[in-house]
């Protein structure tokens, strides 16, 4: 394809709000253009990359007998009401009404639609298992779209759904999909690590995320250098190892703490270690207000609260609700009161005595607080995030942290949707049973960004061979010279038989062409320049900058050998 005919609006400067490296490079190299916050147009180069990613996904899906379909993006509210997610999903669900006042959503996922699709057709165990997938735009009303394609309001996704008669069949498909995802991310050039994860609003009993390692990643991965343990920090279990070092109980005392609210400020003011300060928080869980306690150097994990109580309805109490409950502001909140509120504490509070809590009075705290004497704990549990250096739950070593971008996730849904939506089949005994389901997603547009995050240098993108928009960037330095233009045109026609070629025939300075070439990042550059009359061109590899002059009658063989070694 001739570059003069392709829409590639490269930029010299990018908007200041483009924080992520991939966002800057995709804008600068002319692959995407923002329409509005969180919504982008994919320009020709990006479209070619997305097509290549999608081709690899389709090949791997077909290899495990997944069948492609295409479902509507516009979903009627009635389906979401059947599953219970219309009210539970929250403000991220993009809702709209038609001219008759009927409610719809722009789909962020398709569990409801696909369950509705198959429930009238899958009637016997003999029709199972079945796996369906699609590649389609999804929608989510993000509160704060950021990082370009990594957190947008419209995004391209591959979502697959499997249906089974028993758990063994689901397990087999889950493993097939897990392995297919591993192959997909390897083929597209991403270093992605599977980690144990939380199922979130989709639900289900078992799930893994595939995380592309990146400094800009919004998720923290907990891993071990001594085993294959890896988990999203939201799911990393904290194993309690008691270290009771209790001193004699001191007298409970209320002390003044003027204008200090955070645990760190309290520790500094009272000259006490941060881990002896106890933070108190109140959450509303399924409509009930419950108090939670963690030590000052730890952070409460809301995902673990949802898992512990088996609900998605967990939200922090508002300041007004806290005042109404215990007559205290959040900054002075503590567990010593005469109200009927359950108190749950993180396991590691069992190691403490003579600690510090809020006194439920502005500018005051209690010191020398002790559980059992001053207040009672309803139950202990693992309610916090693991910290770097703590022992891992598999006993393999200590927790290490890395940042990652979620590019895929696989779920065992079980019967969550089939039971609520009455999707049943007849088993081999003729008895009606709910379909057992799995679902599996890959963020296709997010994968595009993740590839760029991991494959670049100071000059621009370095595309992996498997997804590159073109194989070769053919550049004529000065197309006004007959020998260069003629040789460039001849090579373009010849190379197109074996490769996808982007032919820079523009009437631009050589420096502009080379800068754009580095920025766009095709694997190989072939330059027709001052030695064109001698039948010699320069061949340069993007990944390492190595270049060599090659006779044109040897070029075909040279490129064949070169591409064998390019990843």
Swiss-Prot record:
Gene: proS
CC per GO annotation: cytosol
Domains as described in the record: Consists of three domains: the N-terminal catalytic domain, the editing domain and the C-terminal anticodon-binding domain.
Keyword Aminoacyl-tRNA synthetase: yes
Biological process terms in GO annotation: prolyl-tRNA aminoacylation
InterPro entries, per the entry: aa-tRNA-synt_IIb, aa-tRNA-synth_II, aa-tRNA-synth_II/BPL/LPL, Anticodon-bd, Anticodon-bd_dom_sf, Pro-tRNA-ligase_IIa, Pro-tRNA-synth_IIa_bac-type, Pro-tRNA-Synthase_IIa_type1
E.C. number(s) listed in UniProt: 6.1.1.15
Protein name: Proline--tRNA ligase
Annotated source species: Staphylococcus epidermidis (strain ATCC 35984 / DSM 28319 / BCRC 17069 / CCUG 31568 / BM 3577 / RP62A)
Pfam family, one: tRNA_edit
Protein localization: Cytoplasm
Enzymatic class: ligase
Function text: Catalyzes the attachment of proline to tRNA(Pro) in a two-step reaction: proline is first activated by ATP to form Pro-AMP and then transferred to the acceptor end of tRNA(Pro). As ProRS can inadvertently accommodate and process non-cognate amino acids such as alanine and cysteine, to avoid such errors it has two additional distinct editing activities against alanine. One activity is designated as 'pretransfer' editing and involves the tRNA(Pro)-independent hydrolysis of activated Ala-AMP.
GO MF annotation: an example: transferase activity
Main location: cytoplasm
Family recorded in the similarity comment: Belongs to the class-II aminoacyl-tRNA synthetase family. ProS type 1 subfamily.
The keyword Magnesium belongs to this UniProt entry's keyword annotation: no
């Amino acid at each position: 394809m001739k570059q003069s005919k392709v829409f590639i609006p490269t930029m010299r400067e990018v908007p200041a709000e483009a924080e992520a490296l991939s966002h800057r490079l995709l804008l600068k190299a002319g692959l995407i253009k923002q329409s509005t916050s969180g919504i982008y147009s994919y320009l020709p180069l990006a479209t070619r990359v997305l097509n290549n990613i999608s081709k690899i996904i389709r090949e791997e899906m077909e290899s495990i007998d997944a069948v492609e379909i295409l479902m509507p993006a516009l979903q009627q509210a009635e389906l979401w009401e059947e599953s219970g997610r219309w009210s539970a999903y929250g403000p991220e669900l993009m809702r709209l009404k038609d001219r008759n006042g009927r409610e719809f959503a722009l789909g962020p996922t398709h569990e409801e639609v696909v369950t509705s699709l198959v429930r009238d057709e899958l009637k016997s165990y003999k029709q199972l298992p079945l796996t369906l997938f699609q590649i389609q735009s999804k929608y989510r009303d993000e509160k704060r779209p950021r990082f370009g394609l990594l957190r947008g309001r419209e995004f391209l996704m591959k979502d697959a759904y499997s249906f089974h008669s028993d758990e063994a069949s689901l397990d087999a498909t889950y493993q097939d999909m897990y392995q297919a995802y591993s192959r997909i991310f390897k083929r597209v050039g991403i270093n992605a690590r599977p980690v144990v994860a939380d199922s979130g609003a989709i639900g289900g009993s078992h799930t893994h995320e595939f995380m592309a390692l990146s400094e800009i990643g919004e998720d923290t991965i907990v891993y071990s250098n001594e085993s294959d343990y890896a988990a999203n920090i939201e799911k990393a279990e904290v194993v309690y190892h008691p270290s009771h070092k209790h001193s004699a109980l001191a007298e409970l005392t209320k002390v003044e703490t003027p204008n200090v609210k955070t645990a760190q400020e309290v520790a500094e003011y009272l000259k006490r270690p941060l881990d002896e300060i106890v933070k108190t928080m109140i959450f509303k869980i399924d409509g009930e207000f419950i108090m939670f306690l963690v030590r000052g150097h730890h952070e409460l994990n809301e995902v673990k609260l949802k898992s512990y109580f088996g609900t998605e309805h967990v939200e922090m109490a508002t300041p007004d609700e806290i005042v109404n409950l215990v007559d205290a502001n959040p900054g002075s909140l503590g567990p010593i009161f005469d109200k009927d509120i359950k108190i749950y504490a993180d396991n590691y509070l069992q190691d403490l005595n003579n600690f510090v809590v809020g006194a439920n009075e502005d500018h005051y705290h209690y010191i020398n607080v002790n559980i059992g004497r001053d207040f009672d704990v309803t139950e202990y549990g693992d309610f916090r995030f693991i910290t770097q250096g703590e022992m891992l739950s598999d006993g393999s070593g200590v927790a290490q942290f890395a940042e990652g971008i979620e590019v895929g996730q696989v779920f065992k849904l079980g019967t969550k949707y089939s039971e609520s939506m009455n999707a049943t089949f007849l088993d081999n005994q003729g008895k009606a049973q709910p379909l057992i389901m799995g679902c599996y997603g890959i963020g296709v547009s997010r994968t595009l960004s993740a590839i760029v995050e991991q494959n670049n240098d100071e000059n621009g993108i370095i595309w992996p061979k498997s997804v590159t928009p073109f194989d070769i960037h053919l550049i004529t330095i000065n197309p006004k010279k007959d020998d260069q233009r003629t040789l460039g045109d001849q090579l373009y026609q010849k190379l197109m038989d074996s490769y996808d070629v982007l032919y820079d025939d523009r009437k631009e300075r050589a420096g502009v062409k080379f800068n754009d070439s580095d920025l766009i990042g095709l694997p190989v550059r072939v330059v027709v320049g001052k030695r064109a009359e001698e039948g010699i061109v320069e061949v340069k590899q993007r990944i390492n900058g190595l270049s060599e002059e090659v006779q044109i009658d040897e070029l075909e063989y040279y490129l064949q050998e070169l591409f064998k070694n390019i990843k």
